[in-house]
Amino acid sequence: MSKDTAIFAGGCFWCMVEPFDKMPGIISVRSGYTGGFVENPTYEQVCSHTTGHTEAVKIVFDPEIISYAELVNIYWRQTDPTDAMGQFQDRGDSYRPVIFVHDEEQRKIAEESKKALAESGEFDKPIVTQIEDAKPFYEAEEYHQDFYKKNPERYALEEMGGREQFRNQHWN
């Protein structure tokens, strides 16, 4: 089995796991922190907006079953790509939308996809999601992992914080 890795930040990582986790070819989806300057930060440190980290998900996938381009398309459908200061009810730099790329091929796919989205006319504001080189990824505490399975009621409330409505308005 081939393995590749994708890292996406799209607001609260609790809401970014399920859409990928249920797809064929996904080996694992882990919540964590990346993009900052503090080694092995805690949730509390990241929430203080002093570490430079963004909440993100690290996806290990089989590229023979699901492509990186398909993952990028799933990513867009979970986020508001016009909001640089967070996602939905989650505000601040630790919730900013970012596609973290591991190599030039991923960068090319992400940039082409972003350009196509900008030209699609779906949004009347600029697409501000950043595309950045992947940095060390630190897994979040265990209670954050698979949150949608462990805490379905709370997860449903998080989804109702604007994400679900936005998806229905722009993607369905």
Curated annotation (Swiss-Prot):
Q: Which GO terms describe its biological process?
A: protein modification process
Q: What class of enzyme is it?
A: oxidoreductase
Domain of life assignment: Bacteria
Q: Which GO terms describe its molecular function?
A: L-methionine:thioredoxin-disulfide S-oxidoreductase activity; peptide-methionine (S)-S-oxide reductase activity
The EC number on file is 1.8.4.11
As its record notes, the protein acts as a catalyst of: L-methionyl-[protein] + [thioredoxin]-disulfide + H2O = L-methionyl-(S)-S-oxide-[protein] + [thioredoxin]-dithiol; [thioredoxin]-disulfide + L-methionine + H2O = L-methionine (S)-S-oxide + [thioredoxin]-dithiol
User: Keywords of this protein's UniProt record, alphabetized?
Assistant: Oxidoreductase
Write one Pfam family the protein is assigned to.
PMSR
Q: Where is the active site?
A: 12
Spell out the family assignment given in the record's similarity comment.
Belongs to the MsrA Met sulfoxide reductase family.
Functional summary from the UniProt entry = Has an important function as a repair enzyme for proteins that have been inactivated by oxidation. Catalyzes the reversible oxidation-reduction of methionine sulfoxide in proteins to methionine.
Name of the protein in its database record: Peptide methionine sulfoxide reductase MsrA
Q: Which organism is it from?
A: Ligilactobacillus salivarius (strain UCC118)
